[in-house]
Amino acid sequence: MMAPQDTVGSPPAALAAFLRGCERRGAVFAELQCGDPDRGDVALAAALRAFRGNAAALPMADWPVRFWSLLSAAPPLRTAAPDARWQGALSALAAPAPLDRAALLLRLAGGLQEADAADALGLDGAAYRDALARACPRDALGHPDAAAWRAVAEAIQTQLRELPPDRLAKLARLREDALAGTRVPAVAPAKAPETRTVDARRRWPWILLAGILLLAAAGAALWWWQGQAPPSASTPT
């Protein structure tokens, strides 16, 4: 008689590769969303495990949106950590509401296209663009600050490239635990982020955002094609 199939062990190679490709971007997204790397790792571990549990029921084409949806909705990321810290150029991330910050980070840290980022947050295109506009750094006169945008994008790309070896090893352990079905510690529930009324005055020319996102994408592509990514990391998803 055949032994019953082990539903926890032996995950498909495609699933393992997908999670390996997401872990670096997911860790940076989670850390910058809540302002605390440890709290972010709790959220990432929970999202990895939750995704492992339902990936088999999804077409592979739907995997990215589902993963980022799970991570964005993780309770530890719904509010900033009590001791949240964003340093240097990333201090601009402290001001936006959690939803708006997530909209920005799904593009710059998660590497998602606009439609996928909107789907991950459960927003339509217009609502997503409004969230991005609210997350836009402003100068002293309240105008969109292109230099601050570029600085944030460059700082995020630097953080993605330069995660230290011990951090990468921890992320690999989180992935392996998720693939093995290991449970993660429970986290305290957090309040859902406040919704904001769309203020038409805060909308701004999309050529600015599009240009900066293109620069960030070009920087990420250059990093990859120059072979600077660590051998253990797959192409970020």
What are the roles of these predicted feature ranges?
Residues A180-T237:
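C-terminal single-pass membrane-anchor helix
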Residues M1-V28, D38:
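A short, charge-rich alpha-helical start-of-domain segment used by transcription regulators
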Residues A95-A120:
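Short amphipathic alpha helix immediately N-terminal
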Residues A146-R196:
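N-terminal intrinsically disordered, acidic low-complexity segments at the extreme N-terminus
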Residues C22-E31, P37-L90, L132:
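Σ70-family region 2.3-2.4 aromatic/basic alpha-helix that recognizes the −10 promoter
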Residues L121-A151:
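DNA-recognition helix of helix-turn-helix
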Residues S10, G21-R25, A84-R85, A95-R101:
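Alpha-helix N-cap/N′ positions at the starts of helices
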